[in-house]
Every structure is written in structure tokens, then in C-alpha cells.
Amino acid sequence: MDLDDFRSVMDNAGVDVWTFIDTAILVASLDYGQELKRRRDNIVERLYATSMANKCRNCDFGGGGNVTEAAIGRVNNGRVHEETEEEDEEGVTAAAEEEVREKSVNVEDDDDFDPFAGLFDDEQKSIVEIKEKLEDPDLSEESLVELLQNLEDMDITFQALQETDIGRHVNRVRKHPSNNVRRLAKQLVKKWKETVDEWVKFNQPGDLEPPSLIADEDSPVQKALHNGSRQQVPDFGYSPVPQNGYSSSSKNSNITEPERKPRPVAPQPRRESPSPAKPSRPSPSQQTIPRDKEHKEVDFDTARKRLQQNYRQAENAKKQRTIQVMDIHDIPKPKKGGFFPRKGGSSQGGRHW
């Protein structure tokens, strides 16, 4: 487009050049996103190049910024003439290459309006590139370890995890034959799980339902979902249950509370009446056990007493039945005197033995 024609368009629209540029970038990002991604490097290079008025507006800067000719369109009697003009090639290319190499593009952040619509997020771009490389089945162990280490060095947010879907690809290499690969994969999954836990803590269950980032049935969060957790959350790593997992315990309590409220209405008094009676009242079999023990002890005592009495009686009987055998000479002699008592006080009438 000719410069004069462009100026006339802005005058007719009643907008300045900066509003026109912002609107053009926004429309390009919405309607021609892929084309804008392909052209954005050249656009940034042109922004930092010098002498823009002397450059061709339609030439391609894909060759690293080497510009040798510039065309200026002029209107003369309805015909467009192009004139070429040589520039200082070394100065232009050196400045452009230095700016591109150092990546010193400083764009002011605007929270209310994002004209680039997130297209210049270098972190997400790197994550997507790593994800594409992880899809290669012939990837060597060294390359895989390097990619996982690069992911570990990044501070990936929940939004980046959700948009790039890197969690699923890393979760697939948790069962890799290499110990280093398995260790790095588990560390990443654990780190990202903590990020998801923080996001869940600061967001109410009913506000948003983020899609699961890893569809692995071995993950604890996926098991928690099968066990009754209805809130859809990303699945990462091992969690004893936190999980069980993580804050799903609070969610499960919130979900099960309304189910427990109607239950105590009728069954509780029925269950309470027999429950305290069981430990207080021993069964008949339990009551007979101590009684049998007491009877046995009493029987033992009486039997012991009877035996002792029998032994005593036997000893006494033996003593009574003992016959003393004595020699005739050992028999004691009777005392002197009459057998019959004396009469009359005289000793002559009596007999002596």
C-alpha cells in the first residue's frame, strides 16, 4: 500500500497510527494466528532495524537481516515507479543481528489489553518444543535426560501445564528403563502436583474444573477420582492419599456431609440401644466359666480335707491296733499285800501271796 493511501485511510477512519497498529496486530492474532507466528520474527526485526523509511515495506527479512536494496513506491501519473537505493549493509545487519542474538526485546506489559494474545510466551514455546521431542520414540537416553532437566529448571505455572499438556508426555517416561530418566520424571510429576495443589487451594470447587493433564490410571489422583472424588483435577505422581492426594480430603468431606445428615434420623436410636448393652451383659457361657472355676476350686479343697481326715483316722486306727509283745521276765510283778482287804486290824487273819 502506498504511504499516501495509508495516511488517507487513517484520516478517513479517524484513528492515529498507534491505535491502527494495535488493532491490526489483534485482528492478525485472532484471524491469522499461524501466519502471525510465522511472520513475527521478521516483524520484530524490522522494528529494531534502522532507517525504516529507506527499506522496502514488502521485502522478506528471512535471510538474517541482510538488506541490500530498498524500494520506495511513488505515484506519478497513475504509474508506480520503484527506485533502488544502496545502504550501509554492515551497519544495518550488525545492529539487527545483535538485537536478535541478545533477545533484548522489551515489551511493556498491559494487563487490560494484550495485543499479542500470548503469542510471544517464550516459556510455553520451549515447553511445546520439548513436548514434540519427547514424542520421538527413537530419542536417546542422554537427550531425554537433558530435556527433563530443562523442564525441571523451568518454573512452570498451572496455566502453562494446562495449555501445553506437557504432563501427559512426561508421565509416559516414568517407566523408562533408565534410572535417571525415571528419577527426573518422578521429580517433575511431584513438583507439578504441588503446583496443582496450590491452584486448587485458591480456587473453589465450583468455579473452574481444569481438565486432567495426565490420563494415567496409575496416578493417585486418577484413583481418587474413581474412589469418589467428583472434582476434576490434574493427575500427578504418587500420593498416598493424600490423596490421598492432596486437598481432595476436604472436597470429599464437603461432598459426603449432605449424605450423612439424613442418616441419624431413624437408625441411630435403634443402633444405640443394643450397642451399649452388649459389653455390659455377659453371655451365659461367659457367666458359667467363672462359676465352674469356683466349683472346681471348692471341690479340690474339700477333697484335700477329706484325704487329710482319712489319713488321720488311719493313723489313729493303726495306733489302736498295735499289740505290744513283751517277754515274760519283763512282766511287772504284783505288789505285796493280801488280795482281800484286812479285817479287824489283825495281820494274822490275812493271806499273803
Swiss-Prot record:
Residue numbers of Phosphoserine PTMs: 219
Sequence segments annotated as region (Disordered): 225-353
Modified residues (Phosphothreonine): 84
Keyword Transcription regulation: yes
Annotated TM spans: none
Keyword rRNA processing: no
Keywords, sorted A to Z: Coiled coil, Elongation factor, Nucleus, Phosphoprotein, Protein biosynthesis, Transcription, Transcription regulation
GO cellular component, one term: nucleus
Listed CDD domains: TFIIS_I
Bias (Polar residues): 241-256
Cysteine disulfide links: none
Chief place of localization: nucleus
Compositional bias annotation for Basic and acidic residues: 290-304
Domain TFIIS N-terminal: from-to ranges: 125-199
Compartments in which it is found: Nucleus
Recorded GO MF terms: translation elongation factor activity
Recorded coiled-coil stretches: 298-327
Stated family: Belongs to the Mediator complex subunit 26 family.
Subunit and interaction comment: Component of the Mediator complex.
Function of the protein: Component of the Mediator complex, a coactivator involved in the regulated transcription of nearly all RNA polymerase II-dependent genes. Mediator functions as a bridge to convey information from gene-specific regulatory proteins to the basal RNA polymerase II transcription machinery. The Mediator complex, having a compact conformation in its free form, is recruited to promoters by direct interactions with regulatory proteins and serves for the assembly of a functional preinitiation complex with RNA polymerase II and the general transcription factors.
UniProt-listed PANTHER family: MEDIATOR OF RNA POLYMERASE II TRANSCRIPTION SUBUNIT 26C-RELATED (PTHR47210:SF1)
Protein name per its UniProtKB record: Probable mediator of RNA polymerase II transcription subunit 26c
Organism field: Arabidopsis thaliana (Mouse-ear cress)
Lineage: Eukaryota, Viridiplantae, Streptophyta, Embryophyta, Tracheophyta
